[in-house]
Amino acid sequence: MARCGRLRAGTAAKLRRWRKGHSSDCNPETRRHRLAARSRFYSRPTEKSNLTVDAVKLHNELQSGSLRVERPSGSSQLPMEEGDAGEAATERSSGTFLSGLSDCTNVTFSRVQRFWESNSAAHKEICAVLAAVTDVIRSQGGKETETEYFAALMTTLEAVDSPESVAAVAYLLNLVLKRVPSPVLIKKFSDASKAFMNIISSQACSGSTSALRWVLSCLATLLRKQDLAAWSYPVTLQVYHGLLSFCVHTKPKVRKAAQHGVCSVLRGSEFMFGDEAPEHHPAAPSSAKFCVQEIEKAGGTKEATTTLHVLALLRDLLPCFPAAVLKTCCETLLRVMTLSHVLVTACAMQAFHSLFSAQPRTSCLPAELNAQIITALYDYVPSANDLQPLLTWLTTMERAHVNLGRLQKDLCWAHLPRLFSATMNCFLSPHLQVVAAAAQTLETLLNECIAPHMDELGNVSASTPAPGSYLCKMFRSVEEGLTYRFHAAWDGVLQVLEVFFEVCGKQCHPIMRKCLQSLCDLRLSPHFPYTTEVDQAVGAAVGAMGPEVLLEAVPLQIDGKEETLDFPRSWLLPVLRDYVQGARLGFFTSYFLPLAATLKSRALEFAQAGKSLESKIYDTLQWQVWTLLPGFCTRPTDVVEAFKGLARTLGMAISERPDLRPTVCQALRTLIHHGCGTDAERAEVGRFAKNFLPILFNVYSQPEEDGGSSSQRRSVLDTVRAYLTITDPQLGCGFLQKASEKLTSPESSEFARLSILDLVVAMSPYANEQALGSLYRTIQPSLQSKDHSMQKKAYRVLEEVCAAPHAPCQAFVHSHLEELQAVLLDSLKSAASPAKRPRLKCLFHIMKQLSAEHEPFVTALVPEVILCTKEVSVGARKNAFMLLVEMGHAFIRFGPTPQEAMERFLLLVYAGLTGSVTMISCTVLALTRLFFEFRDHMELNVVEQLLQNICLLLGSRTRDVVKAALGFIKVVLLLVDTTLLAKHVQTMLEAVGSLSDDMRRHFRMKLRNLFTKFIRKFGFELVQGLLPAEFHKVLVNIRKAEARSRKQRALRQAAAEAEEEEAPAQPKGDSMEEILADSEEEEEEEEERRRGKVRKKQARQKGQAWLKEGEEDEPLNFLDPNVSQRVLATEPSLKKSRGVKHDFQVSEDGRLIIHDEEEEVDNDEAKGVEEEVADVLQEVGLRSKKSQKRRFREEPDDDEPETGTYSQYRAGGSGIHRPLDKKPAFGAEYRSKKGKGDVKKKGQLDPYAYIPLNRAKLNKRKQAKMQGQFKGLMKGAQRGAKAGRKNRLKDRRP
């Protein structure tokens, strides 16, 4: 029990105490509720009102008419002369105080109209001024043009006195001035500038900055609109200098507005974009002089605030200055960088960077001045340990050299060797960012400064004079990076070498041979970690120099006469295979073919001697040599000269070497597609078609035992198709005639006839019309054949002929159109299931050529096409849907209108609803696809009738029909607008609600999916009210799932926002659109104030600098020209944290967001737009259902059933089979089977280490003991995590 009269311990500090002398006060200080209550009884307000004297004065003047819209004289020149507003009669209306705002017709003030709900006094003042000005313009018969608003606002600006009203008027003027015609502003420049300057002088020392900011912006816009002649008057420059003086103002917003205005004047004045624009703005020299004077005036003050402000201004203005004053500014920047003030140096470097990035004209930045700046910047190289300054220096030097290369290539190349040498020193930096930036800098310089001019050079050697000698020096600097002292950055060095080889390898290979040898030796060193990077670099050398140069520098050291089986450079073969292109085909014939023959003979010798291992090694080597052939056939340089010497060997390899057949066929296809760029090359390769095609025909016609596996036969057939594209048409027709003869020959076996038909399919698109007529008569009996394979391939021939774009094929189809229609109709019932896919494709191509007179033919096809939408073959179903859509397009072509045509077509399809159960389900599928494709051509009554018919079908007792009907409703729900669908929602839900119990159980997932979409579209209450009670439980579950999904998304979004780091400051825009764009950020004043303290703290931290002492006990020499490198922006005592950075997602309140691996998220709960589209595509047959995906992720044959009827069991495969080769997850034995988290198991260790919560352990005397226990636990956990990490790394290694 607590003592009477005393408070409980710990509460005294929480009580609020009276101030001395105020213990008798009983009324609270906060009177918010009293004031709210008083306002309801019409009492006079006692708080400060927004009604000011200036507002009343403005109101009285507006109402009395003394304040009139000032129209500029000489209105015949201006767009403001229509009507005489002075004589217009006015009439008081019952408009409200904001009538002029809410119905303002000028789009200039559309931004202001969102202020009327704001609680900000400044926003309310702006709205009041705009409403009053609009009212007075209307009262005088104005048309609310920008010029009228400008005149009224300028008059208002002179009439108001308070800073708030001045700020409001200036804000509106800032908006309207940008749209006022230039002649108006030129004519009124004197009056307007005088008014602005008076306000600026009166508001310069004011505590509020809003009025000053907007007036400065208005002044900048006014100056920007003046013509070139106006800038010859002293008054214009005087006004401009007034604006310029505020660029060093102490208030940040005022300074920002002035700097933005100065930039817009110098870079965006209208006369700068005319045909007779001057090279630079007339005010540019005086602006440069002002900046130099301000910097010199600031001198070496400690904070250098003014200097920083001027440097920020120069960052945007340097590209606008003429060359003479630009040189003075650059000299001033270099002098101020000697102060070793970290922020000043950084801002000066940013100014140089913006100068070079802007790529100014030669009149602004001559090449000589650019080169002088580059030379001077070498005196300001930061320390290798200073991260951010070094990155800035590298980027600036990169832009400087790129700009110099644009101005004068020779001068740029002369300066590049020194930069390469300095940049290579950055590879010794301990910071990975510096190493990556250095590598990126060198790669950019090579690509932008060197690569465009390499074609002008010949071969470069060590004795080549300039400019080739510069390349030698640059390459020597990079090559030095392969020494051991750069070993920590070898990956970056190898990337630079790769780019060097790509850019300069063709011309500079004589000086690169030693480097290639070093790379190959380096790769053979034990435990070398960068073998992939070496392979890429050597591959780049192969692509640029060619394999001949590489093998001269680095011999393959394989000749078939080795005494040992050690082939140290065999790794070159895969590199050559992946990177060789554009090489001489003759080199492969002269070097690699004899080598492959020698290796093959050596393999045979070892096989005969019983040495299987040696035989296998040499056989693999010769196979690797042959795999180089496709690369040599990619854009070879000597096809015409070299192919004839290689053709015979390739033909023998195809016919006699099944193991080489795929490689040789691939090489031939590559040569045809990517090596025959000219007519001469195509003619040379096509000349050997009479030799290659018979060989390929014979190989393909052989059974699989002799002709190879199915993949090899497919490769041979693809090669035949490729070769036919460059074969003489007469020769192709001869081969086609011979194939037709063998096809009808009784001596041909069934396999031979099927193979010949495959070849005929490949040859038919290239035949002439006479050969096609003969071929058609040959295959016509096969169209009625009972052999399904023959029938299918016969239809494939027709498909290729109908789809071919060549003139003979199109002429044949056009001349035989009636006959083809009759044949395809007669075979309606006799067509086998495998033949339906190509048969439907034939009909698809024929349908495109039909006209209105062929409508009976289309009508006769409708039932068959509808039934084919549920064929077993995936390809047949796909083609049936395509044909159905094409038939719809044909009816639209038939006319008379698309709506009537679709109505006639749907009537034909509706007939299927009266057929069998299968026909009904197929018809519903067809209607779903037709609605998806042609909903824009369907009348509203047609859609309503269609929907009613489908709803009736939901009462069917057949699952297939109900399934198809549910799919149609889903498509309608996703595609039709909510307003059109609202009057049918009751019909649809009543039809769905009337499903039988069996149907409801069977389609429970489909119904859940459908109800989710209904709830998302129409709301929970409406759907629940229209469905029977047995569905309510499902609806409640859906609502809970949707709410849970929304909550999880919100948590994920909050965690993602919490993880986002503060974005780095973006550089100011270089384009004129960005400079002249309105800044929305200026309106967020309160937010800026809140951020101010944080910025000041960061600025103080950034402004700190550290001085690096001399080595050992050596005193620091301040007269050393390199002393600036010892001024660091990074605290040297701070060491980089080596802790492991976790990537856990955290919500706003600090909770970890943990996702279980087995946690299944309902697809419909998290579905976005893409998932909804996927649902529609599945229902209309454009995408396979998720439940019907292929089990083995292979490309199936079109005629295989999609449901996997013929697939065989494979243990550990995909689908429902468990992954046998996957290791169990670590800790899986502790995982709970029902709930989440881990559970304890009897006889096993605890799944986690923990300290039990115990109140007794809060005793301070036992604090040291508890800390020791916790530290031991943490150390043990860290050791275990370290060991686990090592084990995971071992498991990942091959």
Swiss-Prot record:
Q: Quick check: keyword Isomerase in the entry?
A: no
Lipid bilayer topology = Single-pass membrane protein
A GO term from the CC aspect: nucleolus
Tell where it localizes. Nucleus, Nucleolus; Nucleus membrane
Matching InterPro entries: ARM-like (IPR011989), ARM-type_fold (IPR016024), RRP12 (IPR052087), RRP12-like_dom (IPR012978)
- Which superkingdom is the protein from? Eukaryota
Which keywords fit this entry according to its UniProt record? Membrane, Nucleus, Transmembrane, Transmembrane helix
Q: Which residue stretches belong to region Disordered?
A: 66-92, 1049-1144, 1178-1225, 1255-1294
List the protein's name: RRP12-like protein
Q: Which organism is it from?
A: Gallus gallus
Provide the taxonomic classification.
Answer: Eukaryota, Metazoa, Chordata, Craniata, Vertebrata
The gene from which this protein is expressed is: RRP12
